[in-house]
Amino acid sequence: MANKEHRVKQSLGLLEVCGLALAISCADIMAKSASITLLALEKTNGSGWMVIKITGDVASVQAAITTGAHFAEQWNGLVAHKVIARPGEGILLAETPSPSVIEPEPEASEIADVVSEAPAEEAPQESELVSCNLCLDPKCPRQKGEPRTLCIHSGKRGEA
């Protein structure tokens, strides 16, 4: 029993609030109030809700979530909060984002090679360029963003 190493089980805390500014403020207050690790600050689907995910020992996570929930409640932005004291084996691994690999941008010579490989038939010719987004007529002198009255087809709409 002396050979077994004693590990402190990490707990998971979730705080859902309304709005990015409130989420950042809550994460700041929670990090200052207890010894926790901020896992993620995620946008949820709809309503502008944000989820703050933290880990740490059980007491620290409970204290941080309580502090963050109280602060969010003062600003009328608390949606939900939850502390999972001993999450399952795969939960924390699934929650931890993997480091993203940033690919280097292609150099100008590589871009030129790709452009030269494209068939010339697909590129629109100078005379086929459409400047009017209303009538899509290449002969129309109107440019996108100019008044509709400049379109050569402006008086012909809705006629059968």
From Swiss-Prot:
Record key words, sorted: Bacterial microcompartment, Iron
Superkingdom assignment: Bacteria
Domain BMC: 11-96
Pathway: Polyol metabolism; 1,2-propanediol degradation
GO biological process, one term: propanediol catabolic process
Practical applications according to UniProt: Artificial BMCs can be made in E.coli by expressing pduA-pduB/B'-pduT-pduU-pduN-pduJ-pduK (in this order). Enzymes can be targeted to the BMC, and appear to be encapsulated within it.
Conditions for induction: BMC production is induced by growth on 1,2-PD vitamin B12 medium.
Annotated knockout phenotype: Releases increased amounts of acetaldehyde when grown on propanediol. Half the cells seem to form BMC aggregates with visible shells, the other half have no BMCs. Grows normally on 1,2-PD and vitamin B12. A double pduJ-pduK strain grows in an interrupted manner on 1,2-PD and vitamin B12; grows for a while then stops, then restarts as toxic propionaldehyde accumulates and then decreases.
InterPro entries (UniProt xref): BMC_dom (IPR000249), BMC_shell (IPR050575), CcmK-like_sf (IPR037233), CcmK/CsoS1_BMC (IPR044872)
The keyword Iron is assigned to this record: yes
Protein family according to the UniProt entry: Belongs to the bacterial microcompartments protein family.
The protein's role, per its UniProt record: A minor shell protein of the bacterial microcompartment (BMC) dedicated to 1,2-propanediol (1,2-PD) degradation. The isolated BMC shell component protein ratio for J:A:B':B:K:T:U is approximately 15:10:7:6:1:1:2. Not required for structural integrity of BMCs nor to mitigate propionaldehyde toxicity, it might be involved in spatial organization of BMCs. The 1,2-PD-specific bacterial microcompartment (BMC) concentrates low levels of 1,2-PD catabolic enzymes, concentrates volatile reaction intermediates thus enhancing pathway flux and keeps the level of toxic, mutagenic propionaldehyde low.
Protein name: Bacterial microcompartment shell protein PduK
Organism: Salmonella typhimurium (strain LT2 / SGSC1412 / ATCC 700720)
Organism lineage: Bacteria, Pseudomonadati, Pseudomonadota, Gammaproteobacteria, Enterobacterales
Gene: pduK
